[in-house]
Protein backbone atom coordinates (compact mmCIF):
# COMPACT_ATOMS: atom_id res chain seq x y z
CA UNK A 1 0.00 0.00 0.00
CA UNK A 2 2.87 2.35 0.86
CA UNK A 3 4.46 1.78 -2.58
CA UNK A 4 1.14 2.32 -4.35
CA UNK A 5 0.84 5.72 -2.67
CA UNK A 6 4.36 6.69 -3.86
CA UNK A 7 3.63 5.54 -7.42
CA UNK A 8 0.34 7.43 -7.57
CA UNK A 9 2.05 10.56 -6.21
CA UNK A 10 4.74 10.35 -8.89
CA UNK A 11 2.15 9.83 -11.62
CA UNK A 12 0.20 12.87 -10.46
CA UNK A 13 3.35 14.98 -10.42
CA UNK A 14 4.20 13.76 -13.91
CA UNK A 15 0.74 14.67 -15.21
CA UNK A 16 0.90 18.05 -13.53
CA UNK A 17 4.18 18.96 -15.25
CA UNK A 18 2.69 19.97 -18.61
CA UNK A 19 5.24 21.10 -21.22
CA UNK A 20 3.06 22.97 -23.69
CA UNK A 21 5.64 25.70 -24.20
CA UNK A 22 8.52 25.14 -26.54
CA UNK A 23 11.52 24.15 -24.43
CA UNK A 24 14.51 26.40 -24.81
CA UNK A 25 17.72 24.66 -25.72
CA UNK A 26 20.93 26.05 -24.29
CA UNK A 27 23.44 26.16 -27.14
CA UNK A 28 26.23 27.89 -25.24
CA UNK A 29 27.17 28.94 -21.73
CA UNK A 30 29.67 31.69 -20.97
CA UNK A 31 32.71 30.54 -18.93
CA UNK A 32 34.61 33.61 -17.64
CA UNK A 33 37.01 31.40 -15.65
CA UNK A 34 38.55 30.21 -18.94
CA UNK A 35 39.38 33.74 -20.10
CA UNK A 36 42.90 34.45 -21.35
CA UNK A 37 43.90 37.79 -22.87
CA UNK A 38 45.90 36.17 -25.66
CA UNK A 39 42.88 34.10 -26.69
CA UNK A 40 40.77 37.26 -26.88
CA UNK A 41 43.18 38.77 -29.38
CA UNK A 42 43.22 35.65 -31.53
CA UNK A 43 39.46 35.13 -31.32
CA UNK A 44 38.88 38.80 -32.23
CA UNK A 45 40.80 38.23 -35.47
CA UNK A 46 38.61 35.20 -36.22
CA UNK A 47 35.47 37.20 -35.43
CA UNK A 48 36.42 39.88 -37.95
CA UNK A 49 37.00 37.22 -40.58
CA UNK A 50 33.69 35.56 -39.73
CA UNK A 51 31.93 38.91 -40.12
CA UNK A 52 33.26 38.99 -43.70
CA UNK A 53 31.61 35.60 -44.29
CA UNK A 54 28.27 36.83 -42.93
CA UNK A 55 28.49 40.05 -44.95
CA UNK A 56 29.33 38.26 -48.19
CA UNK A 57 26.54 35.76 -47.57
CA UNK A 58 24.14 38.68 -47.24
CA UNK A 59 25.05 40.18 -50.60
CA UNK A 60 25.17 36.75 -52.26
CA UNK A 61 28.71 37.26 -53.57
CA UNK A 62 29.73 33.63 -54.00
CA UNK A 63 33.37 34.31 -54.96
CA UNK A 64 33.97 36.68 -52.04
CA UNK A 65 32.11 34.25 -49.77
CA UNK A 66 34.35 31.32 -50.75
CA UNK A 67 37.48 33.44 -50.36
CA UNK A 68 36.35 34.62 -46.91
CA UNK A 69 35.60 31.05 -45.78
CA UNK A 70 38.96 29.80 -47.07
CA UNK A 71 40.79 32.65 -45.33
CA UNK A 72 39.04 31.86 -42.04
CA UNK A 73 39.86 28.16 -42.39
CA UNK A 74 43.54 29.05 -42.95
CA UNK A 75 43.54 31.28 -39.86
CA UNK A 76 41.88 28.53 -37.85
CA UNK A 77 44.52 26.03 -39.00
CA UNK A 78 47.27 28.41 -37.92
CA UNK A 79 45.74 28.97 -34.49
CA UNK A 80 45.22 25.23 -33.97
CA UNK A 81 48.96 24.66 -34.30
CA UNK A 82 49.99 27.62 -32.13
CA UNK A 83 48.14 27.27 -28.85
CA UNK A 84 49.04 29.79 -26.14
CA UNK A 85 47.18 28.09 -23.29
CA UNK A 86 48.53 28.28 -19.76
CA UNK A 87 47.82 24.60 -19.02
CA UNK A 88 46.69 21.43 -20.77
CA UNK A 89 43.08 21.65 -19.57
CA UNK A 90 42.52 25.11 -21.03
CA UNK A 91 44.48 24.13 -24.11
CA UNK A 92 41.97 21.31 -24.67
CA UNK A 93 39.10 23.82 -24.42
CA UNK A 94 40.75 26.02 -27.05
CA UNK A 95 41.74 23.22 -29.43
CA UNK A 96 38.50 21.22 -29.26
CA UNK A 97 36.29 24.30 -29.72
CA UNK A 98 38.37 25.59 -32.59
CA UNK A 99 38.44 22.16 -34.25
CA UNK A 100 34.65 21.82 -34.05
CA UNK A 101 34.29 25.27 -35.61
CA UNK A 102 36.76 24.36 -38.37
CA UNK A 103 34.82 21.16 -39.10
CA UNK A 104 31.64 23.20 -39.52
CA UNK A 105 33.47 25.56 -41.90
CA UNK A 106 34.65 22.60 -43.97
CA UNK A 107 31.06 21.36 -44.20
CA UNK A 108 29.97 24.86 -45.28
CA UNK A 109 32.39 24.76 -48.21
CA UNK A 110 30.87 21.47 -49.38
CA UNK A 111 27.27 22.74 -49.47
CA UNK A 112 25.86 23.71 -52.87
CA UNK A 113 22.13 24.20 -52.25
CA UNK A 114 21.26 27.69 -50.95
CA UNK A 115 18.95 26.42 -48.19
CA UNK A 116 21.53 23.87 -47.04
CA UNK A 117 24.22 26.55 -47.13
CA UNK A 118 22.05 28.75 -44.90
CA UNK A 119 21.55 25.91 -42.44
CA UNK A 120 25.28 25.14 -42.42
CA UNK A 121 26.20 28.80 -41.91
CA UNK A 122 23.87 28.73 -38.91
CA UNK A 123 25.71 25.66 -37.60
CA UNK A 124 29.02 27.50 -38.06
CA UNK A 125 27.63 30.47 -36.14
CA UNK A 126 26.42 28.31 -33.25
CA UNK A 127 29.76 26.45 -33.12
CA UNK A 128 31.69 29.74 -33.13
CA UNK A 129 29.51 31.33 -30.43
CA UNK A 130 29.89 28.16 -28.37
CA UNK A 131 33.68 28.39 -28.81
CA UNK A 132 33.73 32.07 -27.76
CA UNK A 133 31.62 31.27 -24.68
CA UNK A 134 33.86 28.35 -23.73
CA UNK A 135 37.04 30.43 -23.86
CA UNK A 136 35.43 33.27 -21.88
CA UNK A 137 35.82 35.87 -24.63
CA UNK A 138 35.58 39.43 -23.22
CA UNK A 139 37.50 41.76 -25.58
CA UNK A 140 34.30 43.15 -27.10
CA UNK A 141 30.60 42.70 -26.53
CA UNK A 142 29.23 40.01 -28.80
CA UNK A 143 25.59 40.56 -29.70
CA UNK A 144 23.70 37.47 -30.82
CA UNK A 145 20.64 37.73 -33.01
CA UNK A 146 17.82 35.37 -33.76
CA UNK A 147 14.94 36.45 -35.95
CA UNK A 148 11.59 35.80 -34.24
CA UNK A 149 10.38 33.58 -37.07
CA UNK A 150 9.14 30.00 -37.05
CA UNK A 151 10.60 29.32 -40.50
CA UNK A 152 14.03 30.78 -39.78
CA UNK A 153 15.42 30.22 -36.29
CA UNK A 154 18.96 30.97 -37.44
CA UNK A 155 21.52 32.77 -35.30
CA UNK A 156 24.00 35.43 -36.33
CA UNK A 157 26.21 37.76 -34.32
CA UNK A 158 27.78 41.18 -34.51
CA UNK A 159 29.55 43.91 -32.58
CA UNK A 160 26.56 46.29 -32.61
CA UNK A 161 23.23 46.04 -30.78
CA UNK A 162 21.30 45.96 -34.08
CA UNK A 163 21.88 44.04 -37.28
CA UNK A 164 20.22 42.90 -40.50
CA UNK A 165 19.41 39.23 -41.07
CA UNK A 166 22.17 37.76 -43.29
CA UNK A 167 19.94 34.78 -44.13
CA UNK A 168 17.06 36.73 -45.68
CA UNK A 169 18.01 39.10 -48.51
CA UNK A 170 14.46 40.40 -48.86
CA UNK A 171 14.34 41.50 -45.21
CA UNK A 172 16.54 44.57 -44.71
CA UNK A 173 15.00 45.45 -41.36
CA UNK A 174 17.33 46.08 -38.40
CA UNK A 175 16.90 43.57 -35.58
CA UNK A 176 17.84 44.10 -31.95
CA UNK A 177 20.12 41.57 -30.31
CA UNK A 178 18.37 38.64 -28.68
CA UNK A 179 21.33 37.75 -26.45
CA UNK A 180 24.71 39.01 -25.34
CA UNK A 181 27.47 36.40 -25.17
CA UNK A 182 28.84 37.59 -21.85
CA UNK A 183 25.48 37.62 -20.05
CA UNK A 184 23.42 34.61 -18.97
Where are the regions that the model predicts?
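C-terminal motif of bacterial Sec signal peptides marking the signal peptidase cleavage site
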Residues: 11-14
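Juxtamembrane and targeting peptides
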Residues: 21-23
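Phosphate/NTP-binding elements of NTP-utilizing enzymes
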Residues: 8
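Positively charged n-region of N-terminal signal peptides that target proteins for export
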Residues: 1-4
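Bacterial signal peptide processing site
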Residues: 16-19
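Mature extracytoplasmic or organellar-lumen-exposed domains after removal of signal/transit peptides
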Residues: 26-184
